[in-house]
C-alpha cells in the first residue's frame, strides 16, 4: 500500500477534460456559494480545498497551520470540503471555518480539481493565486512555498506570478473532476 500511494501521489493529478481555469485577476461572485460573515468583507480570503480521505491533504496540515498562525490577522482562512462525503464534518484539525461545496460549483468556478489546493482571493474576491502549497509533499521546501509567496505579495500590494510548478496539481481528484 505504501509504495502504491508513494507512486500515485508523486505523479501529477490528471487534468480533467474541458477544465476551465479563470485567469488570475478574475473576480469571483461568492455570494451564491459561500455565506461569508460581514466582518470578512474586504479582507483577503484563502480557500483551502481539503479532503480528510486524501493523504496529500493530511501531509500539508502542518504547513497550513504555520500559514494560519503567521497570517490569520491579515487573511481569512476557510476550509472547503468536497461534496459527496459521508463524513463531511471531519476536518483538518486546523480550526478553520468550513464550507461544504455541495455541488462542486465553487471548485469548478475557481478551476480547482484536486486536494490539497489553495485559492487566494483579494479583498474584492479577485483570484490572486490558485495552485499547490509547495512542490515538496511535506511542504518543506521554503523556496517553493507558493501560497506563502502569494500571500506576502498580496499583502505588499504586489502581483505574484506563480511558476508553472505551482499550478501542476498533485493529490486527490475531486469527485466531479475526473479526467
Model-assigned labels for residue ranges:
Residues 95-97, 112-119:
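Structural micro-motif
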Residues 127-128, 132-179:
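Thiol-/selenol-based redox modules, centered on thioredoxin-like
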Residues 20-44, 63, 69-71:
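A short beta-strand-turn-helix
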Residues 36-64, 77, 151:
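Short active-site neighborhood of thiol/selenol oxidoreductases, capturing the structured segment around
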